[in-house]
């Protein structure tokens, strides 16, 4: 796990004492830099904890969804024959209209 690999905490960084030599560092500059590191470290830790919680929540939701999916019986989808009568009625209407149109256009020539 990642928390096993992390060696420092924000507190460790804050409390770290550095030795100074003859031509040592500027203490204020190092302190400001360490303060920035601490803030970033705390933000990363907070984000990490939120992501762990979100990950755990999503895993629970996934397991719940899997459980629900296995409990719902799979029923075959049955199509109702509603479309067929409509199709037959449409054909009948078209044939009647065609017959009426032929009578109107050709008149009595068809029946002679």
Swiss-Prot record:
Subcellular localization(s) per the UniProt record: Cytoplasm
Coiled coil: 38-72
GO biological process, one term: cell division
Keyword terms, alphabetized: Cell cycle, Cell division, Cell shape, Coiled coil, Cytoplasm
Main location: cytoplasm
GO CC, any one term: cytoplasm
UniProt cross-references to InterPro entries, sorted A to Z: Cell_cycle_GpsB, DivIVA_domain, DivIVA_fam
Family assignment from sequence similarity: Belongs to the GpsB family.
Oligomer status and interactors: Forms polymers through the coiled coil domains. Interacts with PBP1, MreC and EzrA.
Function: Divisome component that associates with the complex late in its assembly, after the Z-ring is formed, and is dependent on DivIC and PBP2B for its recruitment to the divisome. Together with EzrA, is a key component of the system that regulates PBP1 localization during cell cycle progression. Its main role could be the removal of PBP1 from the cell pole after pole maturation is completed. Also contributes to the recruitment of PBP1 to the division complex. Not essential for septum formation.
HAMAP family reported in the protein's UniProt record: GpsB
Protein name: Cell cycle protein GpsB
Phylogenetic classification of the source organism: Bacteria, Bacillati, Bacillota, Bacilli, Bacillales
């Amino acid at each position: 796990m990642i928390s096993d690999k992390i060696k420092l905490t924000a507190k460790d960084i804050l409390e770290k004492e550095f030795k100074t030599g003859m031509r040592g560092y500027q203490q204020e500059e190092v302190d400001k830099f360490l303060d920035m590191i601490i803030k970033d470290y705390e933000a990363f830790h907070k984000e990490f904890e939120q992501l762990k919680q979100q990950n755990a929540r999503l895993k629970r939701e996934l397991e719940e969804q899997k459980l629900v999916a296995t409990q719902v019986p799979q029923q075959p989808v049955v199509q109702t024959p509603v479309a067929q009568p409509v199709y037959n009625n449409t054909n009948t209407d078209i044939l009647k209209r065609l017959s009426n149109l032929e009578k109107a256009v050709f008149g009595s020539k068809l029946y002679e």
